[in-house]
């Protein structure tokens, strides 16, 4: 079973995340930021991951630290749970519509961290969630997880729908990329390591 549990404590946050790549063993999200909880729940549900997130942060200052640090720990969990990545699909993509919005996420679990993010988020705040931090979260996940991520909103009007489609697309693309393929012999790289 490919799992990871990681706790990260700084002067600004304490984040504990448990991730199960192979079994949707339950989803429990508590960050203190309602919209962010909803997005992480959608990510795990549509990625079919078991995910527990307990995030305590300096929300009296700003939600940015909690959101970004949650991304860091989630990325670290993916990296740890994947181990040497033997037998995985590695590359995958997903398109997800939500009403008038369409998002795409493309991942390469390459061991090389990179983010291309293209989304026009016109509403600056959704509840206690600053929408500009969406990109920071995606960057934190990709860089801590050491994978390549291209995330974009192709079109849409409603900022909530755009962000939710992005989180769902990330979940679905990662679900497909981490899948074990019995036809893949060893590490899926000509280098022999990723």
UniProtKB/Swiss-Prot annotation:
It is an enzyme of class 4 (lyase). Gene3D superfamilies: Imidazole glycerol phosphate dehydratase, domain 1 (3.30.230.40). Pathway: Amino-acid biosynthesis; L-histidine biosynthesis; L-histidine from 5-phospho-alpha-D-ribose 1-diphosphate: step 6/9. PANTHER family: IMIDAZOLEGLYCEROL-PHOSPHATE DEHYDRATASE, IMIDAZOLEGLYCEROL-PHOSPHATE DEHYDRATASE HIS7. One of its GO terms (cellular component) is cytoplasm. It comes from Lacticaseibacillus paracasei (strain ATCC 334 / BCRC 17002 / CCUG 31169 / CIP 107868 / KCTC 3260 / NRRL B-441). Belongs to the imidazoleglycerol-phosphate dehydratase family. It catalyses: D-erythro-1-(imidazol-4-yl)glycerol 3-phosphate = 3-(imidazol-4-yl)-2-oxopropyl phosphate + H2O. This is Imidazoleglycerol-phosphate dehydratase. One of its GO terms (molecular function) is imidazoleglycerol-phosphate dehydratase activity. PROSITE patterns: IGP_DEHYDRATASE_1, IGP_DEHYDRATASE_2. Keywords: Amino-acid biosynthesis, Cytoplasm, Histidine biosynthesis, Lyase. Its EC number is 4.2.1.19. The keyword Amino-acid biosynthesis applies. HAMAP family: HisB. One of its GO terms (biological process) is L-histidine biosynthetic process.
């Amino acid at each position: 079973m490919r799992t990871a549990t990681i706790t990260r404590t700084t002067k600004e946050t304490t984040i504990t995340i448990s991730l199960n790549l192979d079994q949707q063993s339950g989803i429990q999200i508590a960050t203190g930021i309602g919209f962010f909880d909803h997005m992480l729940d959608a990510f795990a549900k549509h990625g079919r991951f078991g995910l527990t997130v307990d995030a305590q942060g300096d929300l009296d200052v700003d939600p940015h630290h909690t959101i970004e640090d949650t991304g860091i720990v989630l990325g670290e969990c993916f990296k740890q749970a994947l181990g040497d990545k033997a037998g995985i699909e590695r590359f995958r993509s997903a398109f997800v519509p939500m009403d008038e919005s369409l998002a795409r996420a493309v991942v390469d679990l390459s061991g090389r961290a990179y983010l291309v993010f293209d989304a026009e988020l016109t509403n600056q705040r959704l509840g206690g969630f600053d929408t500009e931090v969406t990109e920071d979260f995606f960057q934190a996940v990709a860089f801590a997880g050491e994978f390549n991520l291209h995330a974009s909103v192709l079109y849409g009007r409603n900022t909530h729908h755009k962000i939710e489609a992005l989180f769902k697309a990330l979940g679905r693309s990662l679900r497909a990329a981490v899948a074990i393929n019995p036809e893949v012999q060893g590490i899926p790289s000509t280098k022999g390591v990723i």
